[in-house]
Each structure stands twice: as structure tokens, then as C-alpha cells.
Amino acid sequence: MNKIVHKVAEAFRKNGVPRTKWLNPKTIYGLANQKLLGSVEAPHAQGTGLNTVPQVEHYTKACRTKQRDMVRSYLEATGSTHFARLNTPAYNKSSALEFYAKLKALQRYTEGEEVLFQMSSVEVREIISRLVKLTQEGDQIPDEQRRFPTELFMDVAPVPNFNDDPGILEQYIGILTHSAFYYHNTSKIDPIPHILRDLLHPQNEKTASLRTTTMFNDLIYYFGKKSDYASCREYYSQMKLEKKTPNIETYRLLFLNLLKNMQIPKKQLPYKEMIFYLNDMEKFGVPADAKIWAYCYHLLVESVSKKLLLEKMIQHNAPISPDFIVSILRTLDVDCKAILEFAKEYSIPFTPKLLRLCISKLCKEYKFESAWQLLTSLCRSTDVVTTGSVNILLNAAAEKGRLDLAVLTYNSMKVQLGVTPDLRTHRLIFKAMARNGYHENFQDVYHWAVWSMKRSTSGWFVHDAWSRRCESMIKQKCGSVTPPTTENMEKVAAILHRGVWDNRGLFIRCWGEYKELRHVFRLLGSIPPAYKGKTA
């Protein structure tokens, strides 16, 4: 690892982080090698003009035109003429692609990066100077403590009767923007953008006095997830037009959207937009926190500017978060052991992002045993083990077609890790099935996977490409999918639920290590070639 990364980590260590727990990398490798929805369910919305959820429709060319017209009328209602999409110039795609290709070519070479720095050094220095000016001493700004369910298996609820209470409206908008709704019409147009645009429409007098900065932040977050960055900028402008003061969360989201938008070919660097937002932060008295510094670092397009920013960060005692150090480590070509030793040396606490990075590294090294040992070591005393980190291991097993590893990890994540599977977890089981291939018990395992998903999704079965591939494999071999009997389903479930990792941990060669579970592996069709056709 280069010197500047060590300097950043040393600066972080000087600040001190209480209640930090460390793991010995040698131990990990050694052991391994050996009430929120209450208001949403209101049946009717009164006095809003949105009593029902709009009819969904197929996403056709006519529908795209309708969407553009809706956005145009929305912007015209603000009374402002500075919105770009009110007078959209022709997008010069070839020019953007040419600039993007030249930028990528320059980034490949040291000489090219120096050229990029010379081209943009004035803007880079202005960005850094404004960051330094906006940085306040003392404690870091805490994140907003708002909790929403990530997945909801229900139809989108109608707008509740908020009765001039911004709290109810704010909660409803928060759920729509932060929760993924899975309903019967998932192949049709999502009605949520229509509802959100109507609720915050400039001419909607019933919600005008109830709108808050948090509501606009939620919409910026939502449309940022959908990569609709133009809408994000427009809601930021509307927020200012309606005299709602932006806060630190607003600018975190805007800088994050800038970072995600860099993946799309552009005709210019993002520096002018960065300076614009930093100027607005100064205007509204919003300080720059650790996340703003981190986003600015990643928005810089070459290493000279990044090194300069890190040096100023250390020099002026700017806030440094553990996740920022993790994001730098993610760009380096180092293995998991080096990351663990680095984290221990500089007292970097284990966070969910650091854990996901370590699990990803271990899976790329095909060290599934080490990954499972790391998960079990952390789950007993910390809350950093999440469904997302387990899904990384599950995905690695599914990529290899190891249905045996996937199913035993799926069963064990609930029992040993105390982690609840999500929709992606179940979809990875179907992926492992499809990659594993068809066998005589394939249909039984398929019905078990469907049954397991329904237990976690309120009885809904949400198809994806992998479940449909499994279904087509059954139809190709059997002609149709035969509905399971209750007796057979209970028998299959009883057998498969016995498959869990015990104190021995995960083993890639589980057929030899877990001989008592060979009946489970046979049911899954995960039999080593040397044992196929044998009874042992």
C-alpha cells in the first residue's frame, strides 16, 4: 500500500474510535484452513386528488412521450425558466463518447494523468480550498436515524389522510422512496414516480404548506436510485424556490449522484457542478463532513489531485470515516489478509462495508471457508454482519454451481448468524440450481426453493431470470411443472433443513467432511463425479 494511504490511516487512528473490536488475521486463516406501516395502510386519501393508485401501463414509446410531457408541465408549474429540460438542446452523443474515450485513455498512463491535472488544476485547488473552508472542528455530523423496510410484498398503498400533519405525509413519502415494492404488476410501469410527482407538484396546494426538506431529500434519493439525475437536480432547485433550506443530507445525496453519474459519457468533468454545490453549502451554512470529503475524493479523475486532497485532509484535520478508508482500500490490489492486518495496525473498526470488502476478496481467492469463518467470528459480538455480506458468499457459491454450499449457507445464516434472508438471497438459490444443472430431484428442490421464498415474502413468489430458467429446465425435461403434494413438500423440507454448517464450519469439499449429510447432497444433486451411481 502506498504511503499516502498509511498517512490517512494514521490520521484516523489519532482521532480515536471507542469500542473497537479487532480480529487476528492469522486466527481467521488458521481456523478456516483447518410499527412503521400503520399509517400507510389507510384505505383512502381524502382531499388530495390522489384517492387511488394510478393505473399501470405498458412502457411504450407513447408512454415515454407522456412521461416527458408530465415532467415538462411539472417544471413549467414552478414558474422558473432556468430548468434545462424546459428547453432541452440536442444531445451530442458522439461528442460525449469521444470526450469519455479520451478521458479513459489519459487515465491509463502517468503522463496522461499529469496532463489532466494541468487542465483542471485551478478547479481542483478551488474545490479543495472550499472543502477546507467548510470543514468545522469538533464532532462529526451524525446520520439521520430513519428506518424503513427495504422490501415490501404488497401493492403500493394509496395516499393516507394526513390531516395537515406533515409527519404522516413525510413518513408515507419515506416509505415510497426507501422501500422496494413487489406486487403483481412488477412488469408494468411503476406508479410510485407518478404519486411522488403529484404530491410535490408546485400547484398542489394541499401539500404545499406541509413540504419539508426531508421530503425533497427523499425524492432526490429515490430518483438517484433510478439514475434519473435530471429529476434530482430539479427537485433541488424546487426546494430552494420554495424556501426549504437544504441540509447536509441534501448535499450528501447530490454528491453521491454526481459520482454515480460519472459512469455515463459526458462532455466535461464534474468539477463545475462540485464547485456549484460547495458554493451553495457555504451560502446555506452547511459544513462539509466526512462523506462530502469522501465523495469529492472519488470525483477527482486522476491520482495527482487525489493525493493533493488527501494531504490537505490530513493537514487540516478533516473528518475521516472508516468507510472512506475502506473505499480507498477497495481500489488497491491487495488481498484480504493485508486488509485485516492494515485495519488492526491503524485501529480501523469493522464496519459492514469493510466486512463486505473482505468477503469479496476471500471469495475471489476461492477461500469460502475463510469467508464463513470471518462471518461467524463477527456475528457473536458485533452487528456488522448483514444479509448483504452473506449474499456475497452465496453469490460466489452460485456462480460455481455449488448448490450444496448455497443451501447449507442459506440454512446456517438464519441459525448461526441470526441474519434474515432477503429476496436476493432466495434468487441466488435459484441461480445455484440453474448453474448446478438438472437432476432427478430437481423439481422437488425447485418447489422447496419456491416455498422458502414465499415464507419470507408474505406468500408472494417473485420471478426473476434464474427462477424462470429453472422452470424452463423442468418443462424441457418433464413437459410441465407438476404441483407438489403437501406430503412430499414436507418430506423434502425436513431433509433439506438438516443441512447446516456446525462447529467444523464451511468446507468446499463438504461431501467428505460432512458424511452424515450425504443424503442432503444427493437430494440437491450435488454429488462428486467419483461418487455418482454409487450408494455410499
Swiss-Prot record:
It is a peripheral membrane protein. It is found in: Mitochondrion inner membrane. InterPro entries: TPR-like_helical_dom_sf. PPR repeats lie at residues 212-246, 386-421. The keyword Cell membrane does not apply. Keywords: Membrane, Mitochondrion, Mitochondrion inner membrane, Repeat. Gene3D superfamilies: Tetratricopeptide repeat domain (1.25.40.10). GO terms for cellular component: mitochondrial inner membrane. Required for respiration. This is ATPase expression protein 3.
